[in-house]
Amino acid sequence: AYLFLKAQGLAGKEVAYFHINATNRKAMEERNCRITHIKNENDTISFSYLSRSLPFPVDTIPRWGTKGTARDAVRQVPFMQEMNQEIMKVTDLHGNFRVTIDGTEIGRWDGNELSKGINLAEITCTPQYQQSLSIMYLNEERCAIEKRLRQYMAMQYVFFKHRGLLFADNKAALDAAKAERESHYL
């Protein structure tokens, strides 16, 4: 999958990148996102962040009968560095900071770490990561439904059609399927 995505020209495309200067309360750079309502008061900096895309959820559960996980796979290729970067960079901060999104703590960093940038795509408790997980699970469900429909249609046209039982919902169709289930993929 990594090589396919790279061949499609997705290497180097960020999920989002933003750089905020805390002292002058300005978004210095915004790529594939929008930063608004920047405030810096009472040792708290806050802002609104709207990304135009979601991070890729790196699944930690083996799927499709494999022993490995997507997390294992991304350790073998530079996927996170090339295609899953959602960088939050905040400069002109001193001290240690607790970072929250929608009231949920996502981590603690010092001003130096925040000035280098934090890849939010690596943090699984962010709302945007959780949203992308939901989409991933919905897509897997869609895929399973599509598979069942394809199998049903294949059975209708490959097995039942030449027997004159296309879309037959009767005992004759059931008997035909039972009679040949050992010799076919039914």
Predicted regions span which residues?
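Conserved catalytic region of serine esterases and O-acyltransferases that act on ester linkages
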Residues: 2-186
